[in-house]
């Protein structure tokens, strides 16, 4: 699964070159998308004995489904890598999707650089589980979609990632 995951990240990175060629903006039901990703990673929740708390996700956002799926998969994968007890909470509030874990957290000196290409930080070096591309890719995709990706963290407490969806005035047919 690890090699598969790295290969997928590299392929998505290469696809960024033609990002706008297959961009399809439409209403995407968030709960359905999040549950799809959680189901994909269910075995890891079970193996690690982690809880998952999904709430307030009954909302649709204007985005490209496949690219948002890449972002959510990457963020959930990261949360699972660095969380060994407790769980992950995913919810929507004030035009923002939050993913909050009870993982090991990220040092203040690293949090400012987590979205840089190739940066894996202290945790990535410690666990040898980071390519340094996943969060970079997620940020690039979010920027291309017009979404804001932000992260806050406390060592020993966990990390919260927020994807903010700007209100768009699009004509839907």
Features from the language model and the residues they span:
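Short helix-loop "hinge" at the ATP-lid/N-box region of the Bergerat-fold HATPase_c
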Residues: 79-80
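Conserved micro-motifs of the catalytic ATP-binding
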Residues: 18-23, 56, 60-63
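Short conserved segment of the HATPase_c
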Residues: 106-119
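Short beta-strand/loop element within the Bergerat-fold HATPase_c
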Residues: 85-96
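A conserved beta-strand-to-alpha-helix junction within the catalytic ATP-binding
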Residues: 24-42
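Acidic ATP/Mg2+-coordinating residue in the GHKL
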Residues: 101
């Amino acid at each position: 699964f690890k090699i598969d995951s790295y290969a997928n990240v590299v392929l998505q990175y290469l696809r960024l070159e033609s990002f706008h060629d297959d961009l399809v903006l439409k209403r995407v039901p968030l709960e359905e998308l999040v549950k799809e990703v959680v189901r994909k990673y269910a075995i890891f929740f079970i193996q690690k004995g982690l809880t998952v708390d999904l709430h307030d996700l009954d909302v649709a956002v204007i985005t490209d489904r496949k690219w948002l799926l890449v972002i959510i998969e990457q963020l959930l994968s990261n949360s699972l890598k660095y969380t060994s007890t407790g769980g992950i909470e995913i919810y929507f509030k004030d035009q923002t999707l939050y993913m909050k874990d009870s993982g090991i957290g990220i040092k203040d000196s690293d949090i400012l650089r987590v979205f840089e290409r190739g940066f894996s930080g202290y945790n990535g070096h410690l666990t040898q589980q980071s390519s340094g591309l996943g969060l970079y890719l997620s940020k690039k995709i979010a920027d291309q979609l017009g979404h804001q990706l932000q992260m806050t963290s406390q060592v020993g407490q966990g990390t919260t990632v927020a994807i903010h969806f700007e209100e768009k005035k699009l004509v839907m047919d």
